[in-house]
Amino acid sequence: METAIIAGTGIYAIPGAEFQEQVIETEYGPALINVGRIEGQEIAFLARHGLQHTVPPHKINYRANIRALQKLGVKRALATFAVGSISRGVPPQSVAVVSDFLDFTSGREHTFFNGGESGLAPLDECSVVTAP
């Protein structure tokens, strides 16, 4: 499956879709992913706060969730969110695309890198490719 919906506050199901829960084990812990179909398209549905909204934002295991989606073969994800806006031009229930994002959270991991082999090459081993 190549598509996932990562749902935030207020979205715990998709009308007309039937899902089966799967617990995907990752090196960051288990993640609960619901797998099903929407209009013939197989998708993964991840309720970020849990299906009963029992997981507060600072307790969400983001790394396990993303790694689980990767293990399922997901290539693209649509994420929903329910936050306020500082612009009167974006009233409640608006559909918006985030172009800038500042993450001021603390107390949780912000990377998948845990040391060791990083996949980065020393500069003397790199080549520069330029496009015309």
Predicted regions and their residues:
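Active-site rim beta-loop-alpha module in soluble metabolic enzymes
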Residues: C126-P132
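Metabolite-binding pocket within alpha/beta catalytic cores that recognizes anionic/polar moieties
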Residues: M1-E125
